[in-house]
UniProtKB/Swiss-Prot annotation:
Residues 1-20 form the signal peptide. It is found in: Virion; Host membrane. Interacts with G6P; this interaction is required for proper integration of G3P and G6P into the virion. Interacts with G8P. Interacts with the tip of the host pilus. The lineage of its organism: Viruses, Monodnaviria, Loebvirae, Hofneiviricota, Faserviricetes. This is Attachment protein G3P. It comes from Pseudomonas phage Pf3 (Bacteriophage Pf3). The keyword Transmembrane helix applies. It is a single-pass type I membrane protein. The gene is III. Plays essential roles both in the penetration of the viral genome into the bacterial host via pilus retraction and in the extrusion process. During the initial step of infection, G3P mediates adsorption of the phage to its primary receptor, the tip of host type IV PAO pilus. Attachment of the phage causes pilus retraction bringing the viral particle into close proximity of the host cell inner membrane. Subsequent interaction with a secondary host entry receptor induces penetration of the viral DNA into the host cytoplasm. Its main location: virion.
Length: 483
């Protein structure tokens, strides 16, 4: 009796292991960013298997609340029927997981190139960049210095007096500032020379600018002057804030709070970001596209002939399989199988009876369990196997009882020769077997072995054999008549 209790313990332990709901079951094709379904992605009845379809390039789309979803193809294979139907599902990544993945990606060094459209728009809107070491940084407000010409031109001294004070300038330039505006160096200070403007006649004038320093010796204001012709009279034509000058900004690293705030404010995930986010995200639910196509099997036909009446009875059995999805958009959706069988009986071509039966097969229940709270002083114990599997225990006990002597059945067994005999002749349903999915692990790929070409060849051979049989029958018939 100890054996069946050990069997009960193992069965109960297996049931308990299926109770706890885990993450979405996936597999990743090597060297890709594509999730594929596994046989445990969806709960199915024992006679149904979910097989992945080889797909390297992921199809990704947006879902509500700033999430992303990747489509995955598979096939539901019904064992007893040797047939399968295609099924499409989506591995869903919620907005919270996507944002966490974006943060991890931006924090990873060396990821400054090849970013997706959504992440690129985030960097543009938040004014963030990657530095040379691959770290995400932001410009320092108010920082930087004026951009000087790579090769400053030293101006010759020429002194004039104007309303703005005494300035050292030059009439001779290399290159001529009338054609090359930009920053120039004069007496060690940056000087801006703008474009030339025509003021009429043959006279021209151009602008000069000087940078005023603040108390700390930093440039903070720009004053412009103009030379109005041969009299070299200088006048103040206005000032410009240094903020409007071209500068080389200084950058500082982002804090975690700034990074999270920027992602919350500016980030709109794009399917193009999938390749960047993939190493940092995991799907948190799976959605099956419904309805799943029905499986309509070829009818099975059998016939019999009554030797006394000569009547021919034909029985036609048709079967269709429907799939019903429950717990969709969860960590492990369920698929139930509804199998409908219709049996029509014909006698000499007339329908005499019709019967339809439907069988529903559900996947094994995962069950529920509530572990004891910590500090309760009681340990979790598995229930007694025979307390919930009484029928199994009773049957096992019955098999252990000694077998009685074989009874004498000669009084109820007799040889009866005068019985009606029937003969069923069937050549099958002419249906082609379903493809067989072969997983080649060392190549990390799945191959569907199809029998379509063989079935087409068999169909051609069938007609050739039947034609040959008719010709042979005609030859035999003619030989008998002539003989």
């Amino acid at each position: 009796m100890g054996l069946h209790y050990l069997f009960g313990f193992c069965l109960a332990l297996f049931s308990f292991s299926a109770i706890a709901a885990g993450p979405v079951s996936t597999e990743v094709a090597a060297g890709t960013t594509t999730y594929r379904v596994t046989n445990t992605t969806v709960r199915t009845p024992p006679n149904v298997t979910l097989s992945p379809v080889r797909d390297i390039t992921p199809y990704v789309e947006k879902i509500p609340n700033k999430g992303l979803a990747q489509a995955a193809q598979g096939r539901l294979i019904v064992a007893q029927r040797a047939a399968s139907v295609p099924v499409t599902g989506f591995f869903n990544v919620s907005g919270a997981v996507v944002k966490s993945g974006a943060k991890s990606f931006l924090r990873s060094a060396g990821r400054a190139s090849g970013i997706g459209l959504g992440l690129a728009a985030l960097l543009e809107a938040a004014d963030w960049v990657f530095d040379e070491e691959g770290e995400i940084v932001k410009p320092l407000p108010g920082g930087g210095s004026p951009v000087l010409m790579p090769r400053p031109v030293i101006l010759n001294e020429y002194t004039v007096t104007g309303s703005a004070g005494q300035w050292s300038i030059s009439k001779e330039y290399e290159p001529d500032p009338r054609s090359v505006p930009g920053w120039y160096s004069y007496n060690g200070n940056p000087v801006w020379v703008s474009a030339v403007e025509d003021v009429g006649f043959t006279w021209r004038y151009w602008y000069f600018a000087d940078v005023l320093m603040d108390g700390q010796g930093r440039p903070n204001y720009l004053v412009a002057y103009s030379d109005s012709g041969p009299n070299e009279y200088w006048q103040d034509v206005g000032g410009y804030s240094l903020d409007s000058l071209p500068t080389e900004p200084e950058f500082v690293p982002l804090t975690d709070a700034e990074l999270e705030a920027g992602i919350d404010q500016y980030y709109e995930p794009d399917p193009d970001d999938w390749r960047n986010l993939f190493p940092y995200i995991e799907p948190d639910s799976f959605t099956i596209e419904t309805p799943i196509p029905s499986l309509d099997l070829s009818p099975v036909v059998s016939s019999s002939t009554n030797n006394q009446t000569g009547k021919v009875t034909v029985t036609e059995t048709t079967t269709s399989v429907d799939f019903e999805v429950s717990d969709n958009n969860s960590s492990q959706p369920s698929i139930s199988v509804n199998e409908t069988t219709t049996e029509n009986v014909y006698v000499d071509g007339d329908l005499v009876s019709s019967e339809t039966n439907t069988t529903v097969t559900n996947p094994p229940s995962s069950g529920t369990s509530t572990p004891p709270s910590s500090g309760s002083g009681s340990d979790f114990q598995l229930p007694s196997f025979c307390s919930w599997a009484t029928a199994v225990c009773d049957w096992f006990d019955w098999t252990q009882e000694p077998i009685d002597e074989e009874p004498d059945l000669s009084g109820i067994i007799s040889d009866i020769d005068d019985l009606e005999r029937t003969k069923d002749i069937s050549f099958g349903s002419k249906s082609c077997p379903a493809p067989i999915a072969l997983d080649i692990e060392f190549l990390d790929m799945s191959v569907d072995l199809s029998f379509e070409w063989f079935c087409e060849l068999a169909g051609i051979i069938y007609f050739m054999v039947m034609a040959s049989a008719y010709v042979l029958a005609a030859y035999i018939t003619l030989g008998v008549v002539r003989g």
